[in-house]
């Protein structure tokens, strides 16, 4: 069973991928810095969850 993400995390991640999809990579640390750059998220926990979700989606998109 996988982890279920909150709607606001998914919404933010999809918005970032839609607007800045070409800059995100499969590397979590890089994506974490990019999420900080492109959003106003102050919470470290939420930022990491968004970055992790973006990393997962980008990795799956580039496989196909």
Swiss-Prot record:
Keywords: Ribonucleoprotein, Ribosomal protein. PANTHER family: 40S RIBOSOMAL PROTEIN S17. Pfam families: Ribosomal_S17e (PF00833). This is Small ribosomal subunit protein eS17. Disulfide bonds: none annotated. Belongs to the eukaryotic ribosomal protein eS17 family. InterPro entries: Ribosomal_eS17, Ribosomal_eS17_CS, Ribosomal_eS17_sf. GO terms for cellular component: cytosol; ribonucleoprotein complex; ribosome. The keyword Translocase does not apply. GO terms for biological process: translation. GO terms for molecular function: structural constituent of ribosome. It comes from the Archaea.
């Amino acid at each position: 069973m996988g982890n279920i993400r909150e709607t606001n995390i998914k919404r933010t991640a999809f918005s970032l991928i839609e607007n800045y999809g070409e800059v995100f990579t499969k590397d979590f640390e890089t994506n974490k810095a990019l999420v900080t750059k492109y959003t106003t998220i102050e919470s470290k926990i939420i930022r990491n969850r968004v970055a992790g979700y973006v990393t997962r989606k980008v990795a799956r998109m580039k496989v196909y």
